[in-house]
UniProtKB/Swiss-Prot annotation:
Name recorded for this polypeptide: Dorsal-related immunity factor Dif
Lineage of origin: Eukaryota, Metazoa, Ecdysozoa, Arthropoda, Hexapoda
Keyword presence, RNA-binding: no
Location of the motif Nuclear localization signal: 364-368
Annotated Low complexity bias: 604-624
UniProt key word Cell membrane: no
Organism whose genome encodes this protein: Drosophila melanogaster
Compartment(s) where it occurs, according to its Swiss-Prot or TrEMBL record: Cytoplasm; Nucleus
The protein's role, per its UniProt record: Mediates an immune response in larvae. DIF binds to the kappa-B consensus sequence 5'-GGRNNYYCC-3', located in the enhancer region of the immunity gene CECA1. Involved in the melanization immune response to bacterial challenge, possibly by acting in a Toll signaling pathway that down-regulates Spn27A in response to infection. Part of a signaling pathway involving NF-kappa-B (rel) and Toll-related receptors, that functions in the apoptosis of unfit cells during cell competition. May be part of a NF-kappa-B and Tollo signaling cascade that regulates development of the peripheral nervous system.
GO-annotated molecular function: DNA-binding transcription activator activity, RNA polymerase II-specific; DNA-binding transcription factor activity; DNA-binding transcription factor activity, RNA polymerase II-specific; RNA polymerase II cis-regulatory region sequence-specific DNA binding; RNA polymerase II transcription regulatory region sequence-specific DNA binding
Length: 667
């Protein structure tokens, strides 16, 4: 029926154009569903449909003249007039996927007191049947077809392809859109909706469909209703001028940011943040970071990185912060972020956000600043008298000594002039200059090197390779360990190892307390002479300075005793191995034959040692009150350390002793 009506309207338009000679520039009405017609039949938007009085029945003219209209029409010919505009309030555009009706479009005068009203139009100056076509167009001129659809549950047959069409009988002059609502097309469905309108040639204002390829520029939440009418003139249908309603605003759910898990991030970006919000579409939402100047102009912006799958139930977004325009900032920068809906450009209220410097770059920056500060301070001090290079003292009450240099050359052998024949092997090596002093024989060491007082030396015939395991000399105790052969009896100062010992230590031999000093010494097996524990100067022949590691006196007698006892060792003990026997130390002291001169250097270098030696010497030279009876072997042993022995007198004494025993000596 609608197609037949459209054919009648086209015939009416063509006939009127022939009568008027094409003055009106007629054409076909674009917008009738399924209508044919040549493409050159186009009506201008400002041209009303020609209504020929000869074509209008007389009773219709009288009816129009006598009918009382609510508002008199300013136009004399048939036309459409809007009685009730759609509401200016925001309404909800329903999606098809919601599974419910889109509701209805309230009118401008709708209220709780007066009741609900709906958009209403009226056909003026025409009493015949009228076909009304309603579609959605954009809110801005030129009025192009809008992709949203008009739908109705009760009048499903009247709503096809997103448009609403209805035929008004002659007794009805008004059309009320009471059960018609607006269905929101998805972003992916918008182009298909416009292609369907283009196919059916629904374009009241002949604005073309070029916008079907620019979906992003279409405001999804604002549109208008376009009313178009077709009247019957005789056997023809004539279209009336289309009109549009006031804009209808859809409820584009207000974008609101409820909460952010963090309001700061590094300048490098990439920090993950979760935002809580209200009712967002995962395919139509952006999180925008931006910065403004003092005048409020936007100087920088960047969108956060997230996918539609990062939107959780239209209530939360997990996104990554974008990189700030300057990643080498040294101070925090305050920016703002907001939600943006690309389809309609709606935005949320902005929230403050902070970009802070990267920790690695901040550390490097602080170091550079500190280095520059120090250099600047140095340059400032150079121009003053506080710089160290300018603080030179011309005089001082303290004497400046140079740091002693450590000798790096090979030590050279230096021998005292008084000791050229006392070293059959080599001479001791030392670096420092030595004092002039008398030489003496050193029987403590087996080599020509200077032995240390911190080591003890094994017997010449002992199998010991070292005696490092022997406990060091202890100067704080009054005990001495003495080990003597059975057939020997001589005066000594020190401890001696067993002649038949094959061990590396003498700790296993039972000690015996015999004296006031504590030294470990080892007597050669075939020697019978008094010896001293160790040379206080570490080597024989002279020294630079005696060594005192324990800060105690390391010698038992004075220097004269050392020299005299060593130079008087001329006796040879009998051959053979003897058993070990513990005896009492002989207290008789014999004066040496040779008394060397005192060494002033030692006295000056170590006055405490000399003083201690002077205190010890009188005590050692005092003879004891009780002297034990000497045997024949003791008599022979007691001759050690005396002047050269008169052999003839000794032989006479031996013969006299043998005669007294009744033994005839052999001659």
């Amino acid at each position: 029926m609608f197609e037949e009506a459209f054919g009648d309207i086209q015939e009416i338009i063509n006939a009127s154009m022939e009568l008027n000679g094409g003055a009106t520039g007629g054409g076909s009405v674009a917008g009738a569903v399924g209508g044919g017609g040549a493409a050159h039949h186009i009506l201008s938007q400002s041209t009303s449909l020609p209504v020929m009085p000869s074509h209008i029945p007389l009773h219709l003219q009288n009816q129009n003249m006598n009918q009382n209209l609510p508002e008199p029409s300013a136009r004399s010919g048939p036309h459409l007039r809007i009685v009730e505009e759609p509401t200016s309030n925001i309404i909800r555009f329903r999606y098809k996927c919601e599974g419910r009706t889109a509701g209805s479009i309230p009118g401008m005068n709708s209220s709780s007191e007066t009741g609900k009203t709906f958009p209403t139009i009226e056909v003026c100056n025409y009493d015949g049947p009228v076909i009304i076509v309603v579609s959605c167009v954009t809110s801005d001129e030129p009025f192009r077809q809008h992709p949203h659809w008009l739908v109705s549950k009760e009048e499903a047959d009247a709503c096809k392809s997103g448009i609403y069409q209805k035929k008004l009988p002659p007794e009805e002059r008004r059309l009320v859109l009471q059960k018609v609502g607006i269905q929101c097309a998805k972003k992916l469905e918008m182009r298909d909706s416009l292609v369907e309108r283009e196919r059916r040639n629904i374009d009241p204002f002949n604005a073309k469909f070029d916008h079907k390829d620019q979906i992003d520029k279409i405001n999804r939440y604002e549109l208008r209703l376009c009313y178009q009418a077709f009247i019957t003139v005789g056997n023809s249908k004539v279209p009336l001028d289309p009109i549009v309603s006031s804009p209808i605003y859809g409820k584009s759910s207000e974008l609101t940011i409820t909460r952010l898990c963090s309001c700061a991030a590094t300048a490098n970006g990439g920090d993950e943040i979760i935002m809580l919000c209200e009712k967002i579409a995962k395919d139509d939402i952006e999180v925008r970071f931006y910065e403004t100047d003092k005048d409020g102009r936007e100087t920088w912006f960047a969108n956060a990185e997230f996918q539609p799958t990062d939107v959780f139930k239209q209530m939360a977004i997990a996104f990554k912060t974008p990189r700030y325009r300057n990643t080498e900032i040294t101070q925090s920068v305050n920016v703002e972020l907001k939600l943006v809906r690309p389809s309609d450009g709606a935005t949320s209220a902005p929230l403050p956000f902070e970009y802070y410097p990267n920790p690695e770059l901040l550390t490097k920056h602080n170091r550079r600043v500190a280095q520059k500060t120090v250099e600047s301070l140095k340059r400032s001090l150079m121009s003053t008298n506080l710089h160290p290079s300018k603080q030179v003292k011309t005089s001082s009450q303290y004497t400046i000594f140079s740091k002693p240099q450590i000798a790096t050359t090979t030590p050279q052998t230096q021998v005292s002039p008084g000791m050229p024949l006392m070293f059959p092997g080599g001479s001791p090596n030392f670096v420092q200059d030595i004092k002039m002093e008398n030489g003496f024989m050193d029987v403590d060491s087996q080599s020509s090197q200077c032995p240390s007082v911190e080591r003890n030396f094994a017997s010449p015939r002992s199998n010991c390779s070292t005696v490092d395991s022997i406990p060091p000399m202890q100067m704080g105790q009054n005990q001495t360990h003495l080990y003597l052969p059975d057939a020997t009896n001589f005066t000594f100062n020190g401890n001696f190892a067993s002649p038949s010992s094959n061990c590396s230590t003498v700790d296993s031999i039972p000690p015996f307390q015999i004296g006031q000093r504590n030294n470990h010494m080892y007597l050669p097996e075939n020697s019978n002479f008094p010896v001293n524990g160790c040379s206080p100067t570490h080597f024989s022949g002279g020294s630079m300075t005696p060594i005192n590691n324990n800060n105690n006196v390391l010698i038992n007698n004075n220097n004269n005793d050392f020299l005299s006892q060593k130079m008087s060792a001329i006796s040879i003990p009998p051959q053979g191995n003897f058993g070990i026997k513990q005896v009492y130390q002989q207290t008789q002291q014999f004066l040496p034959q040779l008394q060397p001169e005192s060494i002033p250097y030692l006295a000056q270098s170590h006055p405490e040692q000399s003083q201690y030696q002077q205190q010890q010497q009188p005590q050692e030279q005092q003879p004891p009150a009780d002297e034990p009876t000497q045997s024949f072997s003791d008599l022979i042993s007691s001759s050690i350390g005396m002047a050269p022995i008169d052999t003839s007198e000794l032989i006479q004494d031996i013969e006299a002793e043998l005669n007294s025993l009744g033994i005839q000596p052999f001659k």
